[in-house]
Amino acid sequence: VITNKTISGKETIDAKGLVVAPGFIDGHQHCIEPYEYRLMLRDGRTTILDTEIGAHGPKLNEWYKRREGKAPLNFGVAVAHEFARAEVLDGFKDWKYLYSPDAGQSRLTKEGWSKTRPTLEQGNQILALIDQGLQQGGLGIGSTVGYMRAGVSAREIFELQKLGGRYGRFISMHFRYTPGDDTGETNGIQEMLANAAALGTPAIASHFNNPGYNMVHELLVRMREKGYNVWGEIYPYAAGSTALNAVFLEPEVWVKALGNKYEDTLQDVATGEFYTQKSREEMLKKEPTRLVIVYKIQESAIVDWIKMPGVAIGSDGMPLIPDDNLTWDTPYEDLPNTHPRTSGAFAKVLRLARENNIPLMQAVSMTSY
């Protein structure tokens, strides 16, 4: 409650000279594990959700039970489109984590989850697995279609959004052409928004902080003005993070189509070294899902993103791999390297707002919505 009236409560603190703000909500976090809880709490986050990949549908109940009464923050998860495809098209069943971190294995040796167009029967099996997750309490549907652009048809995305709509749930989507150029980014969200308009269903644009972000933002704003429940999120970094074998990092896309150089844009998380095409090919043979940092846009764009109204912050935080023997008590200096957004996304928004004369209430709104 924000009010000028006299109020009372169980506890009173002296907040003179300070700002009282709600706990921050991170709707895009791929690691909801004890060894990362401290990192997120120190960044002001009190609610952590995995909405982009999510958990495997039949495993939703088990995912929640593993955390009930054990987590010092609020948590939730969407149902994973990618994992339903991995089970149906690749026979994958090695569910160690039940959610996002399992992608390190499901993407390792087989490619059906990414490249195979399902038959009608297989498509219905995929939807049935996702439906199980929605029935078990999945917040919505997470689709990483940008990693599966060859295998996922427009009809499949439409049916996903239709299924979520039956429960009043959202789809959160890594767009079909993300990362890409400004036209691809915009076309990717238009697929999702057209379905949302036709079906009247909610939709979240995952990390649209890519080339084309201005038009994506305008589309979101104009659709909300017309009453549609659609919104987007960004993280305050010019670089992203993903697996080395991501389809959009293939030379045909990253180098030839988008004009990037591996030597300038593709960095190994563990070593800090930049890849060449040759060293990438060599590492793909050894560790295809190795984490990398991807530089994709100019730093100056970050302030533009934080100025945009009606946008939420989602860290897109990554698991710390390998995570064997990591616990709540593991010293910070013993944690493996990862993208800094994992632990610093929300504090960075506050700093950039302060340094660039962006209203504090704008920053608080972005971080707590």
Identify what each model region corresponds to.
Residues L360-Y369:
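Short, well-structured alpha-helical segments that form the helix of a local strand-helix-strand
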Residues G17, H28, G44, F75, ...:
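Divalent metal-coordination and catalytic microenvironments
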Residues G69-F75, A154-M173, N195-A198:
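Alpha-helix-loop-beta-strand connector modules within alpha/beta enzyme cores
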Residues H30, I53-G57, R149-S153, P179-G184, ...:
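Acidic-and-aromatic substrate-binding clefts and catalytic sites of carbohydrate-active enzymes
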Residues G27-G76, K93-Y97, P101-D102, L108-T109, ...:
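Alpha-helical scaffold segments that flank or form the walls of functional sites
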Residues V1-A21:
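Histidine-rich, glycine-flanked metal-binding segment
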Residues V79, R85-G151, I189, L193-A197, ...:
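Active-site neighborhoods of metal-dependent hydrolases
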Residues G23-I32, V145, I171-Y177:
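Histidine-centered catalytic micro-motifs
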